[in-house]
Amino acid sequence: MASLPAPPTPLGSCPRGRGGGRVVARPRRAGLACAARSCYRFRTDDDGVVDVAVSGEDGDGGGGGYAVSVEVPGTRGREGGLVLRASGSGEGVPLAPAAGGASLAAELSFDPTRAPFYLSFLLTDASGAEIRTHRKTSFRVPVGVGPGSPAPLGMSISGDGAVNFAVYSKNANAVSLYLYAAAVGGGGGDEPALEIDLDPYIHRTGNVWHVSLASVDGYVSYAFCCGGIRRPLLDPYAKVIGDFVSSNSVYDEGVTAPSMRCFASLAIAPSYNWGRDRHPRLPLEKLVVYRANVALFTKDRSSGLPDDAAGTFTGLSAKVEHFRSLGVNAILLEPVFPFHQVKGPYFPYHFFSPMNLYSSKGLSVSAIKSMKDMVRVMHRNGIEVLLEVVFTHTAEGESECQTISMRGIDNSSYYIANGIAGCKASILNCNHPVTQKLILDSLRHWVLDFHVDGFCFINAPFLVRGPGGEYLSRPPLLEAITFDPVLSMTKIIADPWSPLDISNVQFPFPHWKRWAEVNTRFSIDVRKFLKREALISDLATRLCGSGDLFSTRGPAFSFNHVSRNSGLSLVDLVSFSNDDLLSESSWNCGEEGPSENSAVLQTRLRQIRNFLFILFVSLGVPVLNMGDECGHSAAGSVSYKDRGPLNWRGMKTTFVKEVTGFISFLTALRSRRGDIFQRREFLKLENIHWYGSDLCEPGWDDPTSNFLCMHINAEVDEMAADSVRGDLYICFNANEESVSAALPALAEGSVWLRLVDTSLAFPGFFATESNPKVQQVPGLSSYHVEAHTCVLFESKSALA
């Protein structure tokens, strides 16, 4: 059989094939067996029929290839024969009579290294007249392109090495797959090397478009094009992606806004050796959480890390001893998904890969490995890894040039059509079945592939909304997460804070007794108490685990904090209180901003101790905010954008040694007295007693009352021989003046040991019960509680 040159002719008017090369047909060799066949039938413009079959070849020579059989049934009117001419070639292959003489046929064989491509050809009769399709077009068939499978979504590799692509799009009337031979922005241009238009009759099942390619060798990335608009769109399910590039190209003629795009990589992340890694699976009540931003945690040169490790997952791993020294056993990472670098991590583009910039090489495959390394290091040190996730909105814009992925693929399915009143962001239709599946698949991916231990869902109120913005009593997404066999083994936390409007209001959340919540009321009430603006009953409620919010779940489901990344840092909370900060309930302790007044500085230090003390002696999960242990400041700004990287030089100062030492003491205290502070259930009412300064009833309804004492009787475990533990007596004084507090009577032979007095100098304002210098105070005696001071006593037998 004669050799037939046949240049690749991609659909969609792509100007070139792979590298501008040519596909060469060769005679079929004997002994070749045809593998799976794809058959096509065309009607011709002279009312005839042309049948084409494309098969893979498996030869005993191991070469493999593709066979294309062209057959024209019936010979009437074709007595002079027919010639097949490929587009772009002057040569032709004659069609010979098939067995039985009832049809004319030709068989071509193609080099497999050129697949995938499209074979485009015409037929000519003996007179030279061209025969085309009934639409007056060339006959065109894909080679190395199969129907594919609708599952799984995204790119996947089948057992025979074929690459399957699948994307959900209910409303697209046309879908194309773009393959690129060079990375976007890498000098090779943004136009695809090959475009494959998907046939809705072959490549569509329900609302899923799919196609299979025998090989993608020579290509580096891919994208989808939907609805006939020539704009590459990122596969929502891509696991390895390129960088988000801001650059206009042929797709963006006439646009005024910066154009953003990102292509999915055809690379496969190497399998990861997890070794003996196991989820710590710590009980909720035993958690001590540290919220951190991956980049800002070690980005500053003061971290002492190499440039390629600073601000990365590797940098986080390098500081694991810092977490251990604080007594932290869970880190809560701000969103690590690819995000808008101006708006910040709470405006994601994608949900299946970590941010490329969080790796030393700035590449997706490197980021994947670095994150897994970090998780393994944390687990080895008994520390869980929790992720903040944003599934309520994305950074995709309304304009076409800001359409990056789901908005262009199927806007009406993935997004709420008109958004939500007062919100300009692209709001995801979370409870739509398709978006719900995307979110569930993403969460499972992070658990199964990255060994993540749990998730904190930012902007949780939006997760309970329907397509019209209405509130749902049983949101399908939340219910599915709650009872999912994989996700039900993780920690799931709802956070009401919204990065869209910076609101942070507690709301009735459908929890199924499984969801924990970030307790906004805790922060508000503690701040107001220390500022002398709250009823002491509000403080008492928070100390006991916020029974008004978690009565059906227990105190362990309350994630407590006194500061967070979206507001004032802890040191700013006691240094700034101008009119713009009224919602923060902060107090500057007598002077705004930086001060050299020793009295002001002393009060600020005392207030920092008080905040930390109340955080750790309250029932619930304490959450530390990055930098609060070292006086990290944003100069009084509440804007997320004004936060800077952590300054590690400060770790050597006396102030930081004092604060970090106090935190370590408090975490150890919580662990030692887990019978009181690490409880799944609330304290028994009969074991809690409240007093004023002279052991009388507190002034619950007196707005001027700023002093409260709490006596907690230790529960005795009759099953344990050494279960006798001492009572606790805690005094909280937010007054400007000192108060003389009477201590409750004790059994004969017992004394009160003062473990904490936040007014004393360092070292000495905190001590363990085994410290021989700890102050002993007999029962029914009085203790002088200074202004703005918290004091903790523990009873112990004087003979012990």
From Swiss-Prot:
Residues 1-10 have a biased composition (Pro residues). InterPro entries: AmyAc_plant_ISA2 (IPR044096), GlgX_Isoamylase_N_E_set (IPR044505), Glyco_hydro_13_cat_dom (IPR006047), Glyco_hydro_13_N (IPR004193), Glyco_hydro_b (IPR013780), Glycoside_hydrolase_SF (IPR017853), Ig-like_fold (IPR013783), Ig_E-set (IPR014756). Forms a hetero-hexamer composed of five ISA1 and one ISA2. GO terms for cellular component: chloroplast; isoamylase complex. Starch-debranching enzyme involved in amylopectin biosynthesis in endosperm. Functions by removing excess branches or improper branches that interfere with the formation of double helices of the cluster chains of amylopectin and crystallization of starch. Works together with ISA1 as heterooligomer. The heterooligomer ISA1 and ISA2 possesses higher affinity than the ISA1 homooligomer for various branched polyglucans in vitro, but no marked differences exist in chain preferences for debranching of amylopectin and phytoglycogen between these forms. GO terms for molecular function: isoamylase activity. Belongs to the glycosyl hydrolase 13 family. It comes from Oryza sativa subsp. japonica (Rice). This is Isoamylase 2, chloroplastic. It comes from the Eukaryota. Its EC number is 3.2.1.68. Highly expressed in developing endosperm and leaves. It catalyses: Hydrolysis of (1->6)-alpha-D-glucosidic branch linkages in glycogen, amylopectin and their beta-limit dextrins. Residues 1-34 form a transit peptide. Keywords: Carbohydrate metabolism, Chloroplast, Glycosidase, Hydrolase, Plastid, Starch biosynthesis, Transit peptide. It is found in: Plastid, Chloroplast. Residues 1-22 are annotated as: Disordered. It is an enzyme of class 3 (hydrolase). GO terms for biological process: amylopectin biosynthetic process; starch biosynthetic process; starch catabolic process.
